[in-house]
C-alpha cells in the first residue's frame, strides 16, 4: 500500500440508529474497494466490522470499527459507529477524529431519535453531513414520507442528489440528479448499468436538479453570478459548490442505497472520493494551549490516540490520528500525558478485523499499532521538541448505574483491575468505589451498555459477577432551631476525661445574617461571636460553625476538637446514616476541668450534643433530583407521560419536532433506576433521554418513614 499524502486523505464517520445498516454498508464498501473478495453478513457473524465476540453474541455493534478504502487514488478512512444510544461514545469519538459524517436513515422509519442524537453531535462539532437512505427494498419503505420528515426537521438544507424510481422488493433503479443519469441493477446488485434518465422521470429529475444547482450556487459568489446569467452550472462547478456547502453545513446531500444488495454503494464512494472535503480543507483543530494545529506532514510529529483495547488473538491495539508530521515504525516518541517514552512498533492501515502493514502515515491519516507499553485512550505522543496535548473529546454523563461485586470475594482485586482497563477502552462508562454508599458502582449509558460489560467480564475475563441496585446518596438536614448539651465524663484512676458542650443548631441558607441573640428556655441571650467558620462540605451544602462562648467556659484550644466532633456526626446523619448539610451550629456555653479536659473529651461531647440537637430540630431527608430530557416519537407520548407521572416526575415543558417530542422534567434519582429499561420497553427502543443533576429536595413524609425503617433494619442486620 502506498503512502497517501494529506491532500489525498478523507476521514468519515458512519453514523445511524441501530438497525439502519451501517455494518452492512461498511462490508459493501470494503468489498467494492477490493480489500475482501466475499461479502460477509451480520447474520453469519463474518463481517469485517463487528468482529468482537460480544458483538456476535448480541447481533449489535458495541465498538467503533476503523477501516479504510482506496478509491480513485484517494484514501477514505471510515469509522463504523454503534447505532445504539447505549454506545454513543463510539460516535462521539469518531466525530472528533474524522472530518465529516455519513448518517444512515432506515427507509422503513425515516429519521429516528438516534438520527437526531447523531445530528446534534455533528452540529456541536460543526461537521459536514451526508444523509444516506437505506433499506429501499423494504415493502415498508415510504421514500417520499422519509424526505418530508427530513425536510421538516432539517429544512431546505437537505438537498436530494438521488431518488429511487420505486421502492419495495422490486427496487432496482436510482436517478442521480447531480450526474443526470439513472443507475440500474440486476437482482444481485453489484456493478450498476448507467443509462439516460427515461422520459417519464425527466420532469422530476429536472426539478430536483434545479434545486441542487441553486443550493450549490449559494455557496460561492462566482457560481451565483454564473447561475443568474445562465441558470446552469457544469458538473465540476456543482461539485465545488456542494463541497463548500458541506464545509459550511449549508447543504446536507441526500443519497440512496440498498446496502444489503450492494446497490448504490459504489456511487456513494465515488461522491466521497470526488466531492467531500479533504482533511486540509476542514477547520483546524486546537491543542490544550489553544494553539491552532495545521495538518502538515512537514510539521512537528504529534499523534493522538483515540481508542485502545484488547482484541481477539492480538492483545492491545491502539488507534491513532496523525495530527502533524509523519509517523513510522521505530519512531521514539514521548507521551505528553504520562511523561513516558514509547518506541512505535509496526504501524498499520486499519481494515476492521484485518490490518495492513504500512511504512509511514502522514498528517491527517488514521492508523493503528500494537503492544505499546504505557499509552491510554486520549494520550498524545510527540516527537522531539514538541509538547502538544489534545483533549477535545467530551463524553455525556452516564444514565444507568448498578453496584457490582465478584461472586467470589477473593477475585475483587481482579475485578477492579479488569474494570479499570475496560474503562480505558470505553470512557463513557465509569467505575467508582463509593465510600458513602459502601459499593463499587459502574455507571453507563444504559442497561444494554452494562449488560455487554457483564458478558465481557464473564466470558473474556472468566469472572463471575453480580449486579445489585445502586444505593441512593440521600442527604439529611433540619427544619427548625433546637438546642442540646452533653457532658462527657470518664474517671478510671489517674487523669480522667471531661468535657461539656452546650450548642444550638438551626437550618442554614446561603446569605443568612449572623445571629445576634437567641431565646433559650424563655430567656433571651445575646450572641457574642468569638469565631466563625463557613465550611463548603465536599458532599454539597454548608456547615457554619460559630463560637460564642464567653467567660472562659471553654478554652479556644478545644474549639477544633468540638468542630471535629460535629463534622463526624455530619458524616452520619441520625435518620439514615446519610451526610447532613445546610446546618448552622452555635456553641454558646460549656464546662471544662483543669486536669481532665482534653481534645478527645470535647470531641465526644460535641458529637453527642450535636446528635441530640439534630434529632430535635425537625430532621428531614433530602433526595437528589435530576433534570431529564426525553426524545420520544409522538405516538408514544401518552405512555411516556403516564410512566413519568408514576415516577413522581414534574413535567417542566414540551417541544415538538417532526413526529417527535422533546419532554423536559425534574425527577428523583430513585425513580431513574430502571428508567432506560422502561423507556425502551414503552417505545420499542425508539426513544432516548439525557439527565443532569439539578438539586436536593425534601422527600415525601411517607417515603421518609420508609427510608428510616429500611436503614434501621440494615443497621440491625449488620450488627
Residue ranges and their predicted role:
Residues 1-719:
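Structural and coupling elements of P-loop NTPases
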Amino acid at each position: 500500500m502506498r503512502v497517501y499524502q494529506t491532500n489525498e486523505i478523507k476521514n468519515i464517520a458512519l453514523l445511524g440508529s441501530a438497525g439502519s445498516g451501517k455494518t452492512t454498508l461498511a462490508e459493501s464498501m470494503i468489498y467494492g474497494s477490493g480489500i475482501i473478495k466475499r461479502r460477509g453478513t451480520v447474520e453469519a457473524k463474518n463481517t469485517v466490522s463487528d468482529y468482537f465476540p460480544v458483538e456476535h453474541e448480541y447481533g449489535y455493534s458495541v465498538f467503533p470499527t476503523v477501516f479504510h478504502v482506496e478509491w480513485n487514488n484517494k484514501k477514505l478512512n471510515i469509522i463504523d459507529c454503534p447505532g445504539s444510544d447505549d454506545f454513543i461514545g463510539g460516535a462521539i469519538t469518531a466525530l472528533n477524529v474524522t472530518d465529516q459524517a455519513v448518517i444512515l436513515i432506515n427507509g422503513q422509519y425515516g429519521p429516528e431519535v438516534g438520527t437526531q442524537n447523531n445530528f446534534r453531535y455533528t452540529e456541536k462539532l460543526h461537521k459536514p453531513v451526508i444523509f444516506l437512505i437505506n433499506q429501499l427494498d423494504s415493502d415498508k419503505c415510504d421514500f417520499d414520507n422519509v424526505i418530508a420528515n427530513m425536510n421538516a426537521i432539517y429544512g431546505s438544507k437537505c438537498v436530494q442528489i438521488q431518488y429511487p424510481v420505486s421502492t419495495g422488493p422490486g427496487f432496482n433503479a436510482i436517478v442521480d440528479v447531480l450526474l443526470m443519469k439513472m443507475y440500474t441493477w440486476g437482482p444481485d446488485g453489484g456493478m450498476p448499468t448507467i443509462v439516460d434518465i427515461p422520459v417519464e422521470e425527466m420532469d422530476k429529475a429536472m426539478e430536483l436538479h434545479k434545486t441542487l444547482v441553486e443550493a450549490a450556487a449559494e455557496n460561492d459568489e462566482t457560481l451565483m453570478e454564473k447561475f443568474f446569467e445562465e441558470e446552469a452550472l457544469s458538473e465540476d462547478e456543482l461539485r465545488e459548490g456542494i463541497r463548500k456547502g458541506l464545509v459550511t453545513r449549508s447543504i446536507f446531500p441526500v443519497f440512496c442505497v440498498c446496502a444489503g444488495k450492494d446497490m448504490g454503494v459504489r456511487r456513494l464512494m465515488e461522491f466521497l472520493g470526488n466531492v467531500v472535503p479533504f482533511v486540509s480543507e476542514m477547520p483546524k483543530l486546537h491543542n490544550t494551549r489553544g494553539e491552532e494545529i495545521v495538518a502538515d506532514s512537514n510539521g512537528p510529529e504529534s499523534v493522538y490516540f483515540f481508542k485502545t483495547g484488547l482484541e481477539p488473538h492480538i492483545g492491545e491495539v491502539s488507534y491513532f490520528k496523525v495530527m502533524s508530521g509523519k509517523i513510522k515504525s521505530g519512531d521514539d516518541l514521548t507521551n505528553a500525558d504520562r511523561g513516558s517514552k514509547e518506541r512505535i512498533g509496526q504501524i498499520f492501515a486499519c481494515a476492521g478485523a484485518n490490518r495492513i502493514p504500512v511504512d509511514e502515515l502522514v498528517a491527517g491519516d488514521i492508523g493503528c499499532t500494537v503492544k505499546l507499553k504505557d499509552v491510554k485512550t486520549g494520550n498524545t505522543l510527540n516527537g522531539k521538541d514538541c509538547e502538544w496535548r489534545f483533549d477535545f473529546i467530551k463524553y455525556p454523563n452516564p444514565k444507568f448505574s448498578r453496584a457490582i461485586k465478584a461472586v467470589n470475594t477473593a477475585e475483587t482485586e481482579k475485578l477492579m483491575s479488569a474494570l479499570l482497563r475496560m474503562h480505558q477502552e470505553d470512557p463513557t462508562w465509569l467505575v467508582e468505589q463509593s465510600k458513602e454508599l459502601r459499593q463499587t458502582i459502574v455507571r453507563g449509558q444504559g442497561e444494554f451498555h452494562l449488560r455487554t460489560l457483564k458478558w465481557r467480564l464473564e466470558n473474556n475475563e472468566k469472572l463471575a459477577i453480580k449486579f445489585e441496585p445502586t444505593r441512593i446518596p440521600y442527604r439529611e438536614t433540619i427544619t427548625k432551631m433546637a438546642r442540646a448539651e452533653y457532658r462527657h465524663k470518664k474517671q478510671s484512676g489517674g487523669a480522667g476525661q471531661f468535657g461539656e458542650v452546650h450548642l444550638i443548631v438551626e437550618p442554614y441558607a446561603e446569605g443568612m445574617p449572623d445571629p445576634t441573640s437567641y431565646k433559650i428556655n424563655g430567656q433571651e441571650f445575646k450572641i457574642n461571636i468569638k469565631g466563625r467558620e463557613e465550611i463548603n462540605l465536599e458532599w454539597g451544602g454548608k456547615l457554619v460553625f460559630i463560637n460564642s462562648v464567653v467567660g472562659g467556659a471553654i478554652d479556644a484550644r478545644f474549639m477544633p476538637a468540638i468542630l471535629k466532633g460535629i463534622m463526624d456526626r455530619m458524616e452520619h446523619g441520625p435518620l439514615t446514616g446519610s451526610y447532613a448539610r445546610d446546618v448552622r451550629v452555635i456553641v454558646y456555653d460549656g464546662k471544662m476541668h483543669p486536669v481532665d479536659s482534653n481534645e478527645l473529651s470535647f470531641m465526644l461531647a460535641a458529637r453527642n450534643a450535636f446528635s441530640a440537637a439534630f434529632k430535635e430540630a425537625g430532621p428531614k431527608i433530602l433526595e437528589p433530583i435530576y433534570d431529564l430530557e426525553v426524545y420520544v416519537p409522538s405516538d408514544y407520548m401518552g405512555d411516556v407521560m403516564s410512566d413519568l407521572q408514576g415516577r413522581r416526575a414534574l413535567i417542566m415543558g414540551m417541544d415538538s419536532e417532526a413526529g417527535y417530542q422533546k419532554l423536559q422534567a425534574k425527577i428523583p434519582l430513585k425513580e431513574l433506576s430502571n428508567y432506560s429499561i422502561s423507556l425502551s420497553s414503552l417505545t420499542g427502543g425508539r426513544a432516548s433521554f439525557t439527565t443532569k443533576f439539578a438539586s436536593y429536595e425534601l422527600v415525601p413524609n411517607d417515603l421518609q418513614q420508609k427510608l428510616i425503617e429500611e436503614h434501621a433494619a440494615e443497621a440491625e442486620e449488620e450488627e
